Amino acid sequence: MNPDALLAELDDDQRRAVTCAPSATIVHAGAGSGKTRVLTHRIAWRIAQGTADPSRVLAITFTREAASEMRRRLRSLGVTRHDRADDTDQPTIGTFHSVALALLRRRAADTSAQLPSVVGNRTSLLDQALGENKLGRRSGAVLAEIDWAHARMVSPERYEAEASRAQRKPAIALEQIAVAYRAYEKIKQQRGVVDLDDLISLATRAINDRVDFAAATRFRFRHFFVDEAQDMNPLQFSFLEALRGNRSDVFIVGDPMQAIYGWNGADPAVFARLPDVFGQPTVLALPNNYRCTPQVLEVATHVASGTTLNVRSRRASGVPVEYVEVDDEYEEIDVVRRLAEQHVRIGFDPSFAVLARTNVQLEPIERSLTNCGVPVASRRASAMRTNAIDEVAECRTRHDLTVWAADVIVESTDGDERIVAEQVRAFLRSSSTGVVDGRSAAVFLRASTASPEQYGVELLTFHGAKGREFSHVVIVGAERGLMPHSSAATPEQLDEESRLAYVACTRAADHLTVVRARRRKGRLTTASPYFVSLPDAVERRGATATPTERPRRTAPPHPLVLAERDLRRRLNDVRDGIARTNFTMPEAILSDEEISRIVKDRPRTLEALATILGPLTANRLGAAILRETHESTE
């Protein structure tokens, strides 16, 4: 690696962060400022300068996707190699959970101890802990509160008082949750099992309690890098502190304006206290935004009013942000549909996304777009599965694949990721001899995957959109009760809602459209305070005009297009009806991809339908589906 080449394409602020002294450093990196680039270039530059030993580097982030992206970038910079089976001289890059699990594995191997089993089905374990008092569908709410308590290092005995102080308002009484929490911890102890956050607690305790283990761990890891540090919770921070001991070689990157996970235990105060913890660290900023036009960034800054933001757009001036007021949620859907249809006409490069505060808002929009034949990028299976397969491709040896699959099955609560892990295990069993690596496994996985819709309108919650960017973003539900959400009660929660709106706005690179409905569910609404007294960068419109162009006369759709839309709508109605009867999600009955194939092929026999759905599903749903396909061809 040539150190000068690493700095060649960085701006002055980025270069200052990459080349600062190897002591405690905190970088405030705004949206679109190139923070991951700075972090990876910092690691590469330190190694190139000889001030960091790659085998002693520990880089921690919050998702396996982010860790995989960091590895990819470091490999492109020449730091990691894809053709090396021996990774002992490579940086360690992972999530808090994966690093904790790796340390516990090493500890168990060194002491010939048994590594505790990780709970596979937490809901079932909670039900068993409560016996006749099990909570049924409310178990999810209880487990969410237990996760919050773990993240904040709150014991069952202190839960009720701490949750009350934090003004937590779960669907179940706090005293009931405290009882359930106590029972859950007791049954875990009785059965010798742990859950994910226990891994971090156990690793932290092992370092703090065992001098020999602490010395070995701190000998191994000497240079610390943390991404997205604004999302740290107290438990994760205690783990980081145990890992580093009294070392000052720590490089922290975060954006306080993107701290949006307080509901699950993250505490922005952790990031705010870092200067005091590290003792006179170097504090730097990355103020340049290379993503958003000046107009988009001006509105995002307005949304974050009350917060002093040192950010500036490095983009050329763009089009005004558009604020559209409509009568109700049905007109809101119509505005989104018209915008999406325009986008279909020009293609999906650049990208287009609809963002909402809650998933519930997105469901009718998705149905409307699908019924009108507008492609919708699969929100369920494709993203997590694709990311997991990309991670598999990074594995260099059979051992790497085995460890990756075990980690996912231990760590992940996502069904698609766990399916990929099980498929990797099946692949390894079927390839018991010969050389096996991640690339061959990834080829196998992709070949066995039905291709989901990859191009189309993306529908995401504000939380789900974090870390993403799109050319055109439409934000729906710009009303009080959604922005900010009605569940926000404390000043801290309201501040987080403001940051969440800021995150949503800064997903847009070129075009931002904000839609407000005057009525929702038959009730009058109040405009979101975030979009009151809008700056000059905003153009107000009514529902009669779409944001990018006014309606114009076009030729009527071809009869075949109309027939396809009608069949798609009726198949969706069939799917929804069966799903309601079976108390399940519509996609569990028929996937969007299967409906698209039925619309395209128009099967008229059970045998033809079976080639799409398989014989079992075809036999179960055949009568209802074939009735619709017959009607569409008559």
What are these regions (language model features)?
Residues A21, T88-Q90, A109-D197, F221, ...:
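ATP-hydrolysis module of ASCE/P-loop NTPase motor domains
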Residues D83-L103, N121, C372-C395:
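Conserved beta-strand -> loop -> alpha-helix junction used to position metal-binding or nucleic-acid-contacting
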Residues K521-E634:
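Accessory DNA-binding and partner-docking regions appended to nucleic-acid-acting proteins
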